[in-house]
Amino acid sequence: MTKERTFIAIKPDGVQRGYVSEIIGRFEKKGFKLVGLKQLIPSKDLAQNHYGVHRERPFFGDLVDFISSGPVVAMVWEGEGVILSARKLIGATKPLEAEPGTIRGDLAIDIGRNIIHGSDGEDTAKFEIDLWFNEEELCEWYTSDSKWRSEN
């Protein structure tokens, strides 16, 4: 397994409901390293670019309106297998199908208010990280316990 980066965003419903620290804590407890963090209210342009793959879908406008309706906590996490692990931590897109113990399984009810976004692959992660962050906003740093997290 290789060290990789992924983009995670706590959506306006997750921020408004006070889940920021709990969600960050779940990623830290898993052993991933936070290398980028900021809170912003996304512009319509940013939201449209982020969800561009859904542009032709009937829910696109509502999705853009929602994600730009309030503060989003945008993050970049780093670690071995972080993309797949993050998807497992987050749970199924439809909260009622998400397993207990996942973020959506524990905290969300409605697909339109499912609290969190996570990149679904390496190409998507790179695109989303580059869209939301400038290179100078990402911190290269080393944890003092990194030798206890993995063999490599």
Curated annotation (Swiss-Prot):
A Pfam family: NDK
Segments passing through the bilayer: none
GO BP term, pick one: GTP biosynthetic process
InterPro entries according to UniProt: NDK-like_dom (IPR034907), NDK-like_dom_sf (IPR036850), Nucleoside_diP_kinase (IPR001564), Nucleoside_diP_kinase_AS (IPR023005)
Cell compartments where the protein resides: Cytoplasm
Main location: cytoplasm
Keyword ATP-binding: yes
Keyword annotations of the record: ATP-binding, Cytoplasm, Kinase, Magnesium, Metal-binding, Nucleotide metabolism, Nucleotide-binding, Phosphoprotein, Transferase
PROSITE patterns membership: NDPK, NDPK_LIKE
Active site: residue positions: H117 (pros-phosphohistidine intermediate)
Enzyme class per UniProt: transferase
A molecular function GO annotation: metal ion binding
Catalytic function, reaction form: a 2'-deoxyribonucleoside 5'-diphosphate + ATP = a 2'-deoxyribonucleoside 5'-triphosphate + ADP; a ribonucleoside 5'-diphosphate + ATP = a ribonucleoside 5'-triphosphate + ADP
Annotated ATP binding sites: K11, F59, R87, T93, R104, N114
EC number of the protein: 2.7.4.6
GO cellular component, one term: cytoplasm
Cofactor: Mg(2+)
Function: Major role in the synthesis of nucleoside triphosphates other than ATP. The ATP gamma phosphate is transferred to the NDP beta phosphate via a ping-pong mechanism, using a phosphorylated active-site intermediate.
Complexes and interactors: Homotetramer.
Family membership noted in the UniProt record: Belongs to the NDK family.
Protein name according to UniProt: Nucleoside diphosphate kinase
Originating organism: Prochlorococcus marinus (strain MIT 9312)
Lineage: Bacteria, Bacillati, Cyanobacteriota, Cyanophyceae, Synechococcales
